[in-house]
């Protein structure tokens, strides 16, 4: 069926690259990702390297379940997600049932993203108790709004003020406008996120494992491998 056609096409692309020296027609590539600036930066690097006269590339910043679905249906070659001790058992079961694999790239200590003008901005480390008075911002996950699909680490600490958003720009505007905060990997890009956002280590939370998912029946293309290498550069 469609999977066999995709595998045949992937193999044909590999052979074409091998015997034509990477020439040929319009290059196509798609990835799906949680809301990470480093995923965008790596995508920029990929286009700068392979963006010839013709190409058709896609990057989807979307919900966790949709990332899994995109790779399972082979609409995306790679999916960028994170796992931790809380969600890995459930997510690995879902990945296995969809013939997907998770490949870890980086282990990150959780950080808090806050405005540079936030009352806690001068702290070397921030605790959950100190954050209690401020709005907690997270990415909503639509129909699959389970803790296991969250883009932020699960915390046993109850958050009294919660705001859910769909996109990164809205989240950062609310961080600044409301003195809100979100929990993330701590990898920050001033060009994409702005100079007004800073990352401060969060106390008492376990590490996040950032990586990519692939389809067991698929083959990582040359573009895919180049993108993975670009990711590693930003995650160092």
Question: Which residue ranges define each predicted feature?
Answer:
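Short, small-residue-biased leader/transition segments that mark boundaries at the very start
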Residues: 1-6
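Short helix-loop hinge/linker segments at domain boundaries
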Residues: 9-32, 48-52, 95-101
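Flexible hinge/capping segments at coil-to-helix
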Residues: 23, 94-136
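Central regulatory/effector-binding core of bacterial HTH transcription factors
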Residues: 26-90
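Secondary-structure junction motif
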Residues: 39-42, 88, 128-157, 221-222
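Hydrophobic hinge/microswitch elements
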Residues: 72-77, 82, 141-198
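Short beta-strand->loop
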Residues: 96-107, 186-187, 194-209
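A late-sequence structural motif
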Residues: 198-236
């Amino acid at each position: 069926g469609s999977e066999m056609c995709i595998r045949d096409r992937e193999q044909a692309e590999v052979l074409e690259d091998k015997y034509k020296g990477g020439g040929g027609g319009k290059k196509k590539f798609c990835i799906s990702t949680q809301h990470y600036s480093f995923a965008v930066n790596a995508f920029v690097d990929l286009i700068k390297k392979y963006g010839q006269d013709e190409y058709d590339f896609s990057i989807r910043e979307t919900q966790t379940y949709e990332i899994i679905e995109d790779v399972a249906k082979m609409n995306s070659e790679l999916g960028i997600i994170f796992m931790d001790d809380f969600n890995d058992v459930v997510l690995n079961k879902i990945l296995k049932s969809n013939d997907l694999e998770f490949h870890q790239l980086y282990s990150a200590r959780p950080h808090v993203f806050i405005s540079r003008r936030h009352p806690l901005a001068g702290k070397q480390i921030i605790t959950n108790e100190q954050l209690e008075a401020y709005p907690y911002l997270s990415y909503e996950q639509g129909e699959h709004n389970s803790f296991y699909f969250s883009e932020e680490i699960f915390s046993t600490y109850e958050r009294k003020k919660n705001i859910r958003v769909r996109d990164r720009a809205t989240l950062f505007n609310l961080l600044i406008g409301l003195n809100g905060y979100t929990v993330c990997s701590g990898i920050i890009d001033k060009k994409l996120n702005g100079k007004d956002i800073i990352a401060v280590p969060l106390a008492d939370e376990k590490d996040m494992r950032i990586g990519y998912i692939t389809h067991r029946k698929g083959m990582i293309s040359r573009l895919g491998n180049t993108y993975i290498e670009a990711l590693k550069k930003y995650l160092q």
